[in-house]
């Protein structure tokens, strides 16, 4: 499990970013600002982390996680009126594809919404593998 203290810090930085920008900006603006806050805090973060999804030894698709903190936490950023189940499903897919167990879904809508997802189960012998490519 990702460190709860770290998770609380990240959520605090999300509120700081939302306070600075309010609502209405593109997702990328909030993503960039949150990355800057995490870097200023000395937190190891990678932006737009490629995730290659493999099946039977072949790459069958790519995802890009907005932010990855260390090897333990994926952060997906949204800037929508309200989160919907499809946003949560996207995050669960990232967890399934990578084998990472913890993720945050942060929405910079009219108010900050945060959903924390845990995935502690990965089927043994699963045919799906993911390669977290090193960032640039």
Model regions and ranges:
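Nucleic-acid nuclease catalytic cores
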Residues: 78-130, 135
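Conserved catalytic cores of phosphodiester-cleaving nucleases, focusing on short active-site segments
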Residues: 22, 45, 65-83, 94
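Short beta-strand or tight-loop elements
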Residues: 49, 63, 110
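Solvent-exposed, charged helical/coil patches
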Residues: 1-44, 112-136
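Short secondary-structure boundary/capping elements
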Residues: 59-60, 86
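A short acidic/basic microdomain associated with nuclease active sites
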Residues: 39-57
């Amino acid at each position: 499990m990702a460190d709860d203290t770290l998770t609380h810090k990240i959520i605090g930085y999300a509120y700081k970013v939302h306070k600075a920008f309010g609502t209405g900006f593109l997702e990328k603006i909030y993503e960039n600002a949150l990355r800057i806050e995490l870097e200023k805090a000395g937190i190891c973060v990678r932006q737009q982390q490629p995730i290659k999804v493999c099946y039977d030894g072949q790459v069958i698709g790519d995802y890009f996680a907005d932010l990855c903190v260390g090897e333990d936490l994926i952060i997906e950023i949204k800037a929508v009126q309200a989160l919907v189940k499809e946003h949560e499903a996207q995050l669960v897919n990232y967890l399934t594809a990578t084998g990472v167990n913890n993720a945050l879904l942060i929405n910079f809508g009219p108010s900050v919404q945060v959903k924390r997802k845990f995935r502690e189960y990965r089927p043994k012998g699963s045919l799906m593998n993911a390669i977290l490519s090193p960032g640039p």
